[in-house]
A protein has these predicted regions:
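Single conserved hydrophobic/aromatic residue that forms the stacking wall/gate
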Residues: 208-218
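Short coil-to-beta strand junction motifs in C2/discoidin
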Residues: 85-117
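Generic long, charged, amphipathic alpha-helical segments
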Residues: 131-148, 152
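Divalent metal-coordination and catalytic microenvironments
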Residues: 29-32, 119, 172
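Short, aromatic- and glycine-rich surface loops/edge beta-strands on solvent-exposed regions
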Residues: 166-176
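Exposed aromatic-hydrophobic patches
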Residues: 151-161
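Catalytic cores of secreted or luminal carbohydrate-active enzymes
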Residues: 2-57, 63-89
Length: 218
């Protein structure tokens, strides 16, 4: 429907598992070894490193020393145009092409680069009315990454943790190189001299509007 022109291609939830059984997946969720992306299938690991043990993302650990973290992120696969050969009949292939506009999940062997990794640090309140402006550091640290098919791996420490004597929560964002999105010109505005949208020509949808070569079908 027309409203779909305003939506993104959808986010993804990922979970680290020891096996792909139902129980294995639920165990990963219970252990909070999870992360989300805005859609690309990015691989991400975020570990707390100690002298005796490694704790994965989602862990809660009591420490007296400054924590040391390790992050690794690998970009999603670049997509090849069209659809792979699913071995379907001619009729099924025609129907598939009509449904998805001839574009499927069709990964190549080349991955997108991770351009940087951002670290966010949150310090929980000590009392209900404590101002939160200084407690949420977004972003706290930024690490630029070199282009690599092996992804990006960094290690860092919070040198203020022990001195501050307060609990802290850390999470990371892996930023992938830009990629094309679907239906980015859905309203197709006509602009005045000041750059204001004065008229729209919404993308073709079902039987309500006429299609044009610029239309993108999902």
């Amino acid at each position: 429907e027309r409203q779909s022109s305003f939506f993104t291609t959808g986010g993804l939830a990922a979970v680290h598992v020891e096996d792909r059984s139902k129980q294995g997946i639920w165990n990963g969720f219970k252990n909070k070894e999870t992360y989300a992306t805005s859609g690309p299938q990015i691989l991400l690991w975020f570990d707390l490193i100690t002298t005796s043990e490694t704790f994965p993302m989602g862990s809660k650990v009591n420490l007296e020393k400054n924590p040391v973290f390790e992050v690794k992120a690998v970009g999603s696969f670049k997509q090849k145009p069209g659809c792979p050969d699913f071995g379907l009949s001619a009729n099924d292939n025609a129907r598939l092409k009509k449904i998805c506009g001839g574009e499927c999940f069709n990964p190549s062997n080349e991955r997108r680069n991770i351009t940087r990794i951002e670290v966010i640090k949150i310090t929980p309140q000590n009392y209900n009315d404590e101002p939160v402006d200084e407690l949420i550091e977004d972003t706290w640290k930024v690490f630029d990454c070199k282009p690599s098919q092996d992804g990006c791996k960094i290690r860092f420490s919070d040198r203020e943790f022990q001195r501050n004597g307060r609990d802290s929560v850390y999470y990371v964002r892996a930023i992938e190189e830009p990629s094309l999105r679907v239906n980015g010109d859905n309203l197709r505005c006509e602009y005045d001299d000041q750059g204001n949208c004065i008229k729209v020509n919404i993308c073709h949808c079902l039987l309500y509007t006429s299609p044009s070569p610029r239309d993108v079908h999902l």
